[in-house]
A protein has these predicted regions:
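Short hydrophobic alpha-helices and adjacent helix-cap/hinge residues
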Residues: 2-5, 10, 17, 21-203
Length: 203
């Protein structure tokens, strides 16, 4: 009973935060919601993954995938790491949260980089001339949950992202992708989200 009440409390807080956010537009960028706004929401969403605590074992490492030769990508990655570092203690309950930037332009083997840094969650910045399927193949094989601020990446195969719906941020979830990466998202979260991909019709 307490667990259910806690889940609804988190859901209420998340809905309140989404409703309170004013619209902001980032010109010439692919992210739909400003990084400083999206990161706290995405981290709250992670609280709805029933499998995350067991996989993280007290310490969650968020990898931030970017391209150093693509300025937009590099700038977003910098902002994401800064936003993660600025989160208050307890943002993920008792789990310690850390960030590691992974430069795709300087990485010959993404799977090795993720394993070496013990990444459990991967934020994907805007990428250029990259086959997203190569990223999702690695994330699914390693059981790493993917996040992004680029809505179309979720439709293409990443697990969780944010879009704008009117004047408010909208949670977007590719349910099949999230399950393929090992996440077990609660029904409470799915009711708050726009579900896309193969799992959209059967939550």
């Amino acid at each position: 009973m307490k667990a259910r009440a806690g889940a609804w409390l988190i859901a209420g807080l998340l809905l309140g935060e989404l409703a309170a956010l004013a619209p902001r537009v980032l010109a010439a960028q692919e992210v739909a919601v400003p990084v400083a706004v999206q990161v706290p929401i995405l981290v709250k969403i992670l609280n709805f993954d029933r499998n995350l605590a067991g996989r993280a074992a007290g310490r969650l490492v968020v990898g931030v995938l970017f391209q150093s030769r693509y300025r937009t990508s590099a700038n977003v990655a910098d902002e994401v790491c800064l936003a993660l570092q600025a989160l208050p203690a307890g943002a993920l309950g008792a789990m310690e949260l850390s960030c590691v930037a992974i430069d795709l332009d300087a990485t010959s083997a993404l799977d090795s980089a993720l394993k070496r840094n013990r990444v459990q969650v991967l934020y994907v910045s805007p990428l250029r001339a990259v086959a997203l399927g190569d990223v999702t193949a690695v994330s699914r094989a390693a059981g790493i949950t993917t996040l992004t601020g680029v809505p179309r990446y979720v439709e293409t195969g990443l697990a969780i992202g944010l879009d704008m719906k009117g004047e408010r941020p909208e949670i977007v979830i590719n349910l099949a992708a999230s399950r393929a990466e090992g996440a077990d998202l609660t029904a409470h979260l799915l009711k708050l989200a726009r579900v896309v991909g193969d799992g959209a019709g059967g939550q």
